[in-house]
Amino acid sequence: MTENTVSEIERMVVTRVFDAPRELVWKAWTDPKYVMQWWGPKGFTAPVCQMDFRVGGKLLLCMKTPDGYEGWNAVEYHEIVLHEKIVSSMYFSDSEGNRVEPAQLGIEHEAIDGAHDVTIFEDLGNGQTKLTHIGNEPMESAKNSGQMEGWNQILDKVAAVVAELAQAK
């Protein structure tokens, strides 16, 4: 894994505006039954989602590819501001949540040393919410590796979940 420092590199950022109040977007992002519906790019599923959503808590996810490969991710929560912000660290793991280096999985992943993932939920008024996800990888690397495309596909899936929640409200 290549490491760079936080201040010297432009980080991956994806944003999306949802036609729903911030509380619904937050719910879609933080409730495991909804996370299972959107985790992973288009065509991927998330058959396992164990979430302890609190500062110091952990999220363990299995992301299953269309051809059946199961990859695991873990997330540790460092800061949670209700309906506003989540600061976390995401990493590749085994099914028990133990950290696995990307190279062990045959994955090239460039992380910025000391960078956390930050997800911001901004109330735009008029029932709209802007979600901004700042990743721990350099923008250029995220574009080249497909991470950027994957996160945009994830946000498409989040939009579908949010639309369902808004309709049910």
Task: Name each region found by the language model.
Residues V6-E8, F53, D67-G71, H109-D113, ...:
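A generic structural micro-feature
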